[in-house]
Amino acid sequence: ELYRRALQMVSPCTQIREAISLIMQSRTGGALCFGQPKRLADLSEGGVEVDTAMSPQLVYELAKMDGAILLNHDGTRILSANKFLKPKATIPSTETGTRHRSAERMARQAKCIVVAISERRNTVTLYVGERKHVLDSLPTLLNRASQVLQTLVRFIDALNEALEDLSIREFQDMVTIFDVCRTVQRYERVRRISREMEPYLLELGVEGRLTSLQLQEVMMQTAGAELVVKDFYKDSLKSTSGQLLDRLAEINQEELLKLGNISQLLRYGPNPRTVATYLSSRGYRILTQTQRLTPQLIDNLVERFGSLQQILRAPKEDLVEVDGVGEVLAERIRSGLHLLQNQLALERR
């Protein structure tokens, strides 16, 4: 949470970023510390008390002095300037320069945010607790975010292809564990790539609004994909699909490439030979694609019939017996399922 807040504070078009830009242009260098006043004061000495509202121009002027500038936790007030930072020298640091070494140790000891601006290299390094991040220029950030977005679109296309194939097989009652594991694998890849966009969007701030909208638009295409886990989990689903996907997110990239690991997560065992086993879908995902059924109605249908095939075969009289389903809705469910089945068949041709 602190790291997210730090990236937002130094994103383009913020007052802190404007102050950083002014310092970089003058090539004077500097260090800005953000945190609790008492904690920062205990780990620094000397300097002058300022205690005034923060402004980029004032920070720029104060940075002309050699010492660090201390600000409150959200950077809205300047506490003091020209401070000598005195974190423990025993704290390990990978930095070589005096300013950056002190900044890294200060961030680690005080669990605060420190921005170090190099006067020679003209770079900005962000230290947040144990984390370190070198800020990129706006064009570089936009370019990297665009590359990740293009990669994401390709993976979403592959996921949608797998989902369409899975839907056809669900109607045909010919789904194998391989089909399910492949789809879940592609969905998890999409989730991981989409998460890679988050730090770029945070660092871009308002400059990343267009990229954020593009991300939201492409991710809308994956709506309902998480229900694949709910449809094919072997045992009665005591955990939510979200909890199962959280467990999937914990495995590393190499393990994700092995379908046996996904099969084991779904409780079909780790043996790769099991991927030839046929499964029957419960129908959650398909039902969400037909008429606009509420989650409760879908739960009632699955609880009553147990599988998509049983719902497809159920006469109107049986559907009406489900809690919340009347004659009109029963007919819409039947016609909606058959319409979706025909659409998938036509698209496949």
Enumerate the predicted regions with their spans.
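Divalent-cation
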Residues: 1-255
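Residue-level detector of alpha-helical recognition elements and their boundaries
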Residues: 122, 167, 174, 212, ...
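Residues at alpha-helix termini
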Residues: 109, 321-322
